[in-house]
A protein has these predicted regions:
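Long, well-ordered alpha/beta core segments of mature domains
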Residues: 1, 8-276
Length: 276
């Protein structure tokens, strides 16, 4: 198992050399761990059920990309004896370390479930209909995506600051199912660009006619500058969330942003890791 720091360093080097992108590794780890529900303690990264039916085929998980990533992870796990579940989480950590230059804590101890141990019908109820962190929202859902984000966050046990810093960090890494909210020039760098851009008063936001998305136009030229979802923009329109955005957008908050993101990320990754 991937349980010693020396072993995890070896796996991290393999992941670094795997050819997978930062986005692929981070998205896969999030897709695996974010199924956790604090209400009944189901879901989560433990078991690596993201590689099994029904999770491997969920639209939110980008099945074709997921299979590409899992092929790499399964080879590493098979060669080393580590669990795929641990490799998935470690892969996300590697992606964040590459993007931030800061070490991400890792706790091993996850196991792998089999398809025979997985009740497909039961696990279908864990499928995300909306995940604001990935800017994913199924069509036909009448509940606003920002309200679904709040529900997702409370199921993950996140506070408002943790929800804010996680979403902003994910956007800075170019993670958005719909491509809305991607405003960073360098998606391979974890930074606070999402927050600083959200406070830009040189643009005016208008609905673009597609339901839950908006476009920003330059107030002087009228040119379209960027796009975002309702989920993205609630962090500028809601007074409590905007106050948090202003903290993370400050020029002297970059270290705080990075450290807070890593702490919140680690919390989600370890939600279902019951070692005591």
């Amino acid at each position: 198992r991937c349980c010693s720091s020396a072993a995890s360093d070896v796996y991290k080097r393999q992941l670094n050399d795997s050819g997978l992108t930062i986005q692929e590794m981070v998205e896969t780890a999030w897709a695996s761990a974010s199924t956790y529900r604090g209400s009944d303690m189901r879901g989560g990264a433990n078991g690596a059920r993201i590689r099994l039916a029904p999770q491997k085929d969920w639209e939110a998980n980008k099945p074709s990309q997921l299979q590409k990533v899992l092929n790499v992870y399964e080879a590493i796990a098979s060669e080393s004896g580590a669990s795929i579940a641990d490799v998935i989480v470690l892969g996300g950590n590697v992606g964040i370390e590459k993007a931030s230059g800061v070490e991400v804590p890792f706790t091993a101890g996850r196991g792998d479930a089999s398809q025979e141990q997985t009740d497909v019908e039961s696990f279908e109820y864990l499928e995300p209909r909306s995940d604001g962190f990935r800017n994913y929202h199924q069509t036909g859902i009448e509940i606003n995506p920002e309200e679904m984000l709040l529900d997702k966050s409370q199921l993950l046990g996140l506070t408002a600051p943790e929800m804010t810093v996680l979403l902003g960090g994910m956007r800075s890494l170019g993670i958005s199912h719909s491509d809305y909210g991607i405003i960073s020039d360098n998606p391979n760098q974890l930074d606070n660009d999402f927050f600083t851009t959200l406070l830009d008063m040189r643009v005016a936001w208008q609905p673009n006619g597609t339901g839950n998305s908006y476009e920003a136009k330059d107030r002087v030229s009228g040119d379209k500058v960027r796009t975002a979802s309702r989920t993205d923009l609630v962090f500028g329109s809601n007074s409590q969330l905007r106050a948090l955005v202003e903290v993370y957008a400050a020029s002297d908050s970059k270290d705080k942003f990075t450290n807070d993101f890593i702490k919140a990320w680690n919390k989600v990754m370890n939600n279902d890791l019951f070692l005591d």
